[in-house]
Amino acid sequence: MSASRFIKCVTVGDGAVGKTCLLISYTSNTFPTDYVPTVFDNFSANVVVNGATVNLGLWDTAGQEDYNRLRPLSYRGADVFILAFSLISKASYENVSKKWIPELKHYAPGVPIVLVGTKLDLRDDKQFFIDHPGAVPITTAQGEELRKLIGAPAYIECSSKTQQNVKAVFDAAIKVVLQPPKTKKKKSKAQKACSIL
């Protein structure tokens, strides 16, 4: 058996979008019911990919403004980011491009990002929207549009509560590291030049 490859995967996104629940749901198949804001936490999972073992180091971060100076310390050495927003929070969706992409580009340029829409189970929950009249759901099309805007190789919608697509999120993160998407090479100006003979 070959030595396992280590992948550092860091979750980022606004507070209360479900980053910790996503990690706990993935690593223990349980859904925590109490909300306790994260300062910093670490999880680990061994995953077999194409017959090889991958040790997936999962770093949980605090989305709250209070931790803006502390949070980037976890970015060093990251192989991939899971950038999460809530499918029932327009503010968290808007902060992907307003706050998180600038932060990641500044502290970890070139590291791939998997965009994740969380709380999928609540998007079609009529009772939730009756109880929260100001909430606006984010559509799959809006998520895809945001993925293209930020240049993320993957966009996945999931529910930590029902486990729907939870494994797919981390499979995508591993795949992005092990099989990076081919980037289109831009032609240099010399190649674009027209020659008149």
Swiss-Prot record:
Protein's name according to its UniProt entry: Rac-like GTP-binding protein RHO1
PTM annotation (Cysteine methyl ester): residues: C194
Molecular-function GO term, any one: GTP binding
Species this chain originates from: Beta vulgaris (Sugar beet)
Family according to the record: Belongs to the small GTPase superfamily. Rho family.
Keywords, alphabetical: Cytoplasm, GTP-binding, Lipoprotein, Membrane, Methylation, Nucleotide-binding, Prenylation
A single cellular component GO annotation: membrane
Binding residues for GTP: 13-20, 60-64, 118-121
Native organism taxonomy: Eukaryota, Viridiplantae, Streptophyta, Embryophyta, Tracheophyta
Motif (Effector region): 35-43
